[in-house]
């Protein structure tokens, strides 16, 4: 059992705490699922891009799915090899494209004809041939939250089958483009295997047609990730996920790329916060804690529910429903409504669970609140992997503007 009391003697709340052994196990389970087939697991940095987490994964020979040049440089800084990095995203700037090509990453996932022509022009100016993949929108409902559904025709992502074919043929004729992969991504937090299999089958059929047309594909890039059980939902078994993709690719000698993020890091993380006050307003019980929606946005943005565990011994205290809320000046600054928790006192510590994904990576300084300390638990030892911001950090980049005022 982990000794939180020792932790509280040296570190003030709120802070993120990650169990690195859980991250290792989650990543290695993906490698095991695709064992025996050419594959590359490209961790999706958007889930959590802390350098120490990336370094841990780099040592396990992870690739990286990046959606900005900043993420690419983070991956490289952490030791992930350029030939294991794919660059996705619907709005890559010319600067980002040029940098990615100079770094000689594995390939760029292209999302429009205009982007394709931009890449070609930049590749021509550099005197190189750009490896590209085209993101196909299979128009399949991922059955997930609408904010993170990406595979329907009304979504901004990817291109339809007809346009994809035109883009591949156009790229094939170019002296500065090398089409090497097909890609699709139907959404995040996937709890139903059927849409993934359907999309894999549909895009695999397209891949076979492209190969028949003389396009030398080498990769089959499956975006999106297996969901996590936040509310005791039934999740997809990793073996079934892998077998579904492998079965769809029968007859295709392509390296499989998958891009998990949430399922690698979510369950490793806790947000540790302490009670500031208890209050009752019109018979409603509120527990006010020192973490806020700026630190962890998912409950406010997605109405996501994360279990809350009381760390401080509370045996014998009366249990009743309450809303656990933060100090930010918005009613949406609520971590969990109607949580059945014991009576709590100022200084009591609680843990918000499964926050390793889309927690710190979506944090902000809203209300001029410094970003949090982040800690790693590895081999029974605690170490700091991100320092807590100081108050001075809130305005450090603005001070130059005061000169001459």
Residue ranges and their predicted role:
Residues 2, 8, 244-246, 253-405:
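Charged (often Lys/Glu-rich) extended helix/loop segments that serve as interaction or gating elements
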Residues 139-277, 341, 367, 378:
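Active-site loop/helix belt of alpha/beta enzymes
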Residues 44-50, 67-70, 90-92, 111-113, ...:
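Active-site beta-loop-alpha junctions enriched in small/polar residues
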Residues 23, 46, 68, 100, ...:
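Conserved, mostly hydrophobic/aromatic
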Residues 54, 77, 97-102, 119-122, ...:
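Short acidic, glycine/serine/threonine-rich loops at helix termini
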Residues 1-130, 172-178, 205, 209-212, ...:
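A charged N-terminal "starter" segment
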Residues 63, 86, 107-109, 133-135, ...:
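Structured core elements
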Residues 3, 19-22, 26, 30, ...:
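General structural feature for long, well-ordered alpha-helical segments within catalytic domains
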């Amino acid at each position: 059992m982990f000794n939180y009391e020792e932790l509280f003697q040296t570190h003030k709340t709120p802070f993120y705490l990650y169990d690195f052994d859980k991250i290792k196990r989650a990543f290695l389970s993906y490698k095991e699922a695709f064992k025996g087939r050419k594959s590359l697991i490209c961790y999706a940095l958007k889930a959590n891009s802390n350098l120490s987490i990336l370094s841990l994964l780099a040592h396990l020979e992870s690739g990286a799915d990046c959606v900005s040049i900043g993420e690419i440089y983070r991956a490289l800084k952490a030791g992930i090899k350029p030939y294991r990095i794919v660059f996705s995203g619907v709005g890559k700037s010319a600067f980002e494209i040029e940098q990615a090509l100079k770094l000689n990453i594995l390939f760029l996932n292209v999302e429009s004809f205009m982007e394709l022509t931009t890449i070609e022009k930049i590749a021509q100016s550099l005197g190189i041939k750009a490896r590209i993949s085209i993101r196909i929108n299979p128009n399949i409902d991922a059955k997930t939250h609408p904010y993170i559904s990406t595979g329907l025709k009304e979504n901004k992502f990817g291109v339809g089958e007809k346009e994809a074919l035109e883009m591949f043929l156009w790229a094939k004729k170019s002296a500065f483009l090398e089409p090497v992969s097909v890609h699709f991504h139907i959404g995040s937090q996937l709890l139903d295997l059927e849409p993934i299999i359907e999309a894999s089958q549909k895009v695999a059929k397209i891949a076979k047609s492209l190969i028949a047309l003389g396009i030398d594909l080498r990769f089959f890039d499956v975006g999106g990730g297996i969901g996590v059980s936040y509310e005791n939902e039934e999740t997809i078994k990793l073996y079934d996920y892998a077998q579904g993709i492998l079965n769809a690719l029968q007859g295709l000698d392509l390296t499989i790329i998958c891009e998990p993020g949430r399922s690698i890091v979510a369950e490793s993380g806790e947000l540790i916060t302490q009670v500031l006050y208890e209050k009752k307003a019109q018979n409603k019980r509120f527990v006010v804690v020192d973490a806020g929606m700026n630190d962890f946005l998912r409950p406010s943005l997605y109405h996501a529910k994360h279990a809350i565990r009381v760390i401080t011994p509370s045996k014998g205290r009366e249990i009743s429903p309450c809303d656990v809320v933060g100090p930010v000046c918005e009613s949406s600054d609520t971590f969990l409504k109607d949580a059945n928790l014991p009576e709590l006192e100022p200084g009591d510590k609680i843990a918000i669970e499964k926050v390793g994904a889309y927690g710190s990576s979506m944090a902000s300084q809203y209300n001029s609140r410094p970003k949090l300390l982040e800690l790693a638990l590895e081999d029974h030892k605690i170490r700091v992997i991100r320092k807590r911001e100081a108050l001075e950090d809130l305005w450090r980049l603005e001070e130059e503007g005061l000169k001459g005022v």
